[in-house]
């Protein structure tokens, strides 16, 4: 259900009913649950792979600019010249997050962003999202990630939306009190 909801709000699927509309100042970036389409059959290395997503950024034409973005996601040295088709699941997640950072979006939609990541990578993602000034819509089974990042919990269950301000622990406590 969550993946379907994200696909609908990102325009990849049509809703069965109802409508939604992003505001005119909203720019979105999407981290899909399945990112294989971005890597399968691709013969590019990391730097060149990232370059295909930067034509709108004039300063991104330099290798040092792209390496800096990849460095934020813990790619360094000769790792940036690895072919993307041989990357591990965690490395692909880190590439996708680097790609998202390039867009400068003010809304991020993340479907299970910590899947396949080691602790160091999860920490890097957490730190980046805590500093992010926009809106983050995400689904995750990683309770620590949810507790660290979420300040509003929305639960879609049986056709009903529950919306609560506060952390995940606050939300759980409210369920216990009922």
Predicted regions and their residues:
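ABC ATP-binding cassette signature C-motif
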Residues: 1-178
């Amino acid at each position: 259900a969550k993946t379907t909801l994200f696909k609908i709000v990102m325009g990849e699927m049509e809703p069965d009913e109802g409508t939604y509309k992003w505001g005119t100042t909203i720019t979105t970036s999407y981290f899909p649950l399945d990112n294989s389409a971005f890597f399968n059959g691709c013969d590019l290395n990391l730097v060149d792979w990232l370059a295909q997503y930067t034509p709108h950024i004039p300063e991104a034409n330099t290798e040092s600019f792209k390496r800096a973005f990849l460095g934020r996601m813990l790619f360094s040295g000769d790792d940036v010249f690895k072919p993307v088709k041989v990357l591990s699941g965690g490395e692909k997640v880190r590439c996708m997050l680097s790609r998202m950072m390039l867009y400068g979006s003010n809304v991020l939609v993340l479907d299970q962003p910590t899947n396949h990541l080691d602790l160091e990578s999860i920490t890097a993602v957490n730190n980046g999202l805590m500093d992010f000034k926009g809106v983050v819509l995400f689904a995750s089974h990683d309770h620590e990630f949810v507790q660290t990042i979420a300040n509003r919990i929305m639960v879609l269950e049986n056709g009903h939306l529950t919306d609560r301000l506060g952390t995940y622990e606050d939300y759980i406590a409210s369920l216990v009190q009922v």
